[in-house]
Structure formats: structure tokens, C-alpha cells
């Protein structure tokens, strides 16, 4: 029974990467869009809603697994949630390039070669509608 639960939860788990280099290489290798999510996991209410309503939905997770490489770029404020220094530096460098205005959440979509396709943020829509938004970029 426990094994079945472990397998079921791993199948529905969102595979979030935190390394840009790894995400870019995976997107290129698998010919998938790279979705970069700039978020403040412990202070940004719209970020938390996006996480809960879209990223954590079974529908989005199933679709993303087949079509996207997901990269989480977190900017926590609470000391207890602090990221390792190297992770912080990477996230800040990527924000300088892709999130110059400091919007949170910001969802940046790159093609499999790393070219910018577009960006969006939190929208009060269903997971299917959010998938359509990402695919329209």
C-alpha cells in the first residue's frame, strides 16, 4: 500500500528544477519549452495562488510533464527559507536579465533553444486556460 502511494505521488509530482543550466539543457534535449517562474514563495500572495491553483493542479502537472521544463526561481524573504548562496546569485542574475522590473510572480517562456517567447503572470483562470496562455506565447 505504501509503495503504491509513493508511486502515485511521484507520478503526479511537478518536476521543478532550480538550476538554469540544467533546465536549459533538458529543454534542448527534450525539445520542450522552458518555463521560468520568478516567485516569492513566503511573501507574494499571487505567487502562492499561482502555485496552489495552477502549478499544483493535476491537469497542469500532467500537461507540463509532457510539454514543459519547469524552473523555479524563488526569492524568499524569511530567513528560515533562505536559499544557498549560489542559488541566490543565479536567481538574481536571471532576474537582471529576464525580470528587470521585479514583477512577482513572473512566468517567462523560452523555446527549447533559449529564445524568449513571452511572459505572463498570475491570472484567475483554470489550469486549461493557463496552459492556453502559455502556449499562445
List the predicted regions and their residue ranges:
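Bacterial Sec-dependent N-terminal signal peptides
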Residues: 1-15
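Thiol-based oxidoreductase modules, predominantly thioredoxin-like and allied folds used
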Residues: 16-17, 60-89
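A short beta-strand-turn-helix
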Residues: 17-34, 64
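Short active-site neighborhood of thiol/selenol oxidoreductases, capturing the structured segment around
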Residues: 30-44, 70
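Solvent-exposed loop/turn segments at secondary-structure junctions
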Residues: 41-44, 54, 75-79, 102, ...
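The canonical Cys-X-X-Cys-His
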Residues: 44-47, 107
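Typically the conserved alpha-helix immediately C-terminal to a functionally engaged Cys/Sec
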Residues: 47-65
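Non-catalytic, surface beta->alpha helical segment in thiol-disulfide oxidoreductase systems
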Residues: 96-97, 101-137
Amino acid at each position: 500500500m505504501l509503495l503504491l502511494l509513493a508511486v502515485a505521488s511521484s507520478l503526479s509530482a511537478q518536476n521543478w528544477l532550480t538550476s538554469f543550466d540544467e533546465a536549459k539543457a533538458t529543454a534542448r534535449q527534450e525539445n520542450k519549452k522552458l518555463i521560468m517562474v520568478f516567485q516569492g514563495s513566503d511573501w507574494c500572495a499571487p505567487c502562492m495562488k499561482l502555485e496552489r491553483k495552477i502549478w499544483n493542479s493535476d491537469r497542469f502537472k500532467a500537461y507540463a510533464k509532457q510539454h514543459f521544463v519547469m524552473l523555479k526561481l524563488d526569492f524568499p524573504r524569511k530567513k528560515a527559507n533562505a536559499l544557498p548562496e549560489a542559488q541566490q546569485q543565479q536567481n538574481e542574475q536571471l532576474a537582471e536579465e529576464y525580470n528587470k522590473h521585479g514583477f512577482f510572480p513572473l512566468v517567462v517562456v523560452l523555446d527549447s533553444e533559449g529564445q524568449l517567447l513571452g511572459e505572463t503572470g498570475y491570472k484567475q483562470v483554470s489550469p486549461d486556460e493557463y496552459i492556453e496562455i502559455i502556449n499562445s506565447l
